[in-house]
Amino acid sequence: MDTKQQSTSMLEMVTQSINNFEQATQPTILPTSSSPEEVIEHLISCARPIDFDAIANNPDGKKANVIQKTVITIDEFKKIADQNNRNITIIKGEIFIYNGVYWQNLEENEAKYLLGKVAEAMNYDSIDSQFYRTRDRLYNQLHSAAYTPEDSSETKCETVLVNFRNGTLEVNETGAILREHRPEDKLTYCLKYDYDPNAKCDKFYTFLNQMLPDIESQVILFEYLGYTLTKYLKLEKFLLLLGEGKNGKSVIYEIVRKLFGEENVCNLSLEEVTKDKGYCRIDLHNKLLNYGSEIGGR
């Protein structure tokens, strides 16, 4: 084989190797609204072995130390997440992963499990990757690396955003438009149905006219449910539904629970919410609405 043929053959081999590498590292976009478990397993499967010593590139030729390995691992992990459209951020001290529609909360134990498995896939010693201190270091480093200061202009924003399956409804003084989902909206929920401005439910209005015939009261009910979807409007109000038994309160509750999604509603009584040591108030965190079926005896 002459020199020209050898060069051509080598070029073909290199080209094929590059193609194989690109195919192996091609980002895979998960279905939107994937569960945290699905996101975790997918990100673990995307992790590949890396040479920590080469990346650290210590001038004395020493191996990468613990600090360097921790920083490198999280940097590489964030690259994997970004390449697979799974942006990671810190919102009010908690880790969230964007799934293409909204930001899903990743609990501490889930995050530490994920980071330990990713570290093992990146060439950590198997025992070291399972050690709680290793996972604690990675978890704390992710908090530091993924943190971005909140935009102070957000607190002055008067635009209302409501997240639906088919887009985000943007409401302001000029009107309302349905647009694409955007990670910068920082929405942490998605209502499980499409927005349809022409949708009607005659059966519901028939029920409402029977159980709550006063039109002004109907408007107040609708206004309050809409208020719960606003982020910046601080009315600091709660709504009481008064009445004897079998007057439709439980039907309203079931409708609201389905409307907002069970994962976005909690059910603390007024007594539980107002206790001096209200430890249960932690359940209000990341919820759109608290709907207490009973006031309580306090």
Residue ranges and their predicted role:
Residues 1-84, 197, 201-206, 210:
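Replication-associated primase and helicase/ATPase modules
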Residues 4-21, 35, 84-109, 113, ...:
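P-loop NTPase catalytic core of nucleic-acid-dependent motor ATPases
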Residues 54-57, 61-113, 117-127:
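Noncatalytic partner-interaction/assembly domains of nucleic-acid and motor enzyme complexes
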Residues 75-79, 143-144, 226-227:
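Short, hydrophobic/amphipathic alpha-helical patches that form generic packing surfaces
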Residues 117-118, 124-126, 198-199, 268, ...:
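Short, surface-exposed, polar/charged, turn-prone segments marking secondary-structure boundaries
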Residues 123-134, 215:
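Short, surface-exposed acidic
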Residues 288-298:
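Conserved AAA+/SF3 P-loop NTPase catalytic/coupling segment centered on the Walker-B
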